[in-house]
Amino acid sequence: VNVSSVQDFYQCPFRWVMKWVENRVPKFEGPALAEGKLLHLIFEDHLKGVLTMEEACEVRCREWLRLARETNEPGLMTIAQKAVTGIKDRQEALAQWTDRYEWQIPALEVEEPFEIAFDEMPGVIFRGRPDRVGVMDNEVWHIQNRGLAGSMNFGVYMELATRHYHEHLYAEQNARKYPQYKVGGTLFNLVRKLKYRTNVGKKNEAVKTLDQMFFQHPMTINLKSRLHTHVMQSMFAHVERMQEVEARYRENGTIPPPNEKMNGGFVGNSIDPYFRILTGTASIYDNTLFKDREDTYAPADDTGIEVG
């Protein structure tokens, strides 16, 4: 079970079946998601000591556009251009980003897939791939790089993250894989998707402060706490339900009810690709609309580009 699939399931069982049982996803991802992937690659290049942040922005943006161009898909190229424009709007600020935390071991591993099982879920293997794992103050930490919407409050995000399934699963994995260290939790590197400079060349030209753009903060995870126990129990309960839904779908084609709020897209003003499957006006096997899902927990291909 990919931990991401659990999140997809509780958001919409119908879309979960299309994505994780039929293994079909929309052919074109949204620009915001594409920009998030690009930002993720830039941070990893920089934090591994491969490139300066400015160099990483330049190299990754060029590569992103080149790969999109080679697909000969105008739609993919448009999305790639929007993602690169977003990075360019923040590149000057990204060049000023610094890691505020000192690491004994900056990178025990980077983008390394894992599998883990629990006695409570016999026969189920959970899969994940943390961004980076490092050691600070004799504790092992998952380092999560994340781009957020410009309107997202850092404090709100951090509070909501206390129940993110990924982070609790990664803490369990780190405890088993690195028993020589105590478990710290997750260190978040957050970036708001804001333009660094606005009204360029005008009287009211302004720049954002770095504190408006960036936020870096640790979230501790206590494996013996009631919170952690309940998060894991909740994830297990969802997986049991997932197994039931998949079995009924495979046996007699029973389609689970959708989350109708998702029919209008992210903000409700567009048609979600899966909606037309529900209305019978499109097919999940139409290759002009959907493509096969790629395994996001396979070893990283170092591009981040998904080609339909």
Give the ranges of each region predicted by the language model.
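Hydrophobic/aromatic-lined pockets within catalytic cores
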Residues: 22, 44-51, 134, 148-151, ...
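Non-catalytic protein-protein interaction segments used by genome-maintenance enzymes to assemble
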Residues: 105, 109-166, 171
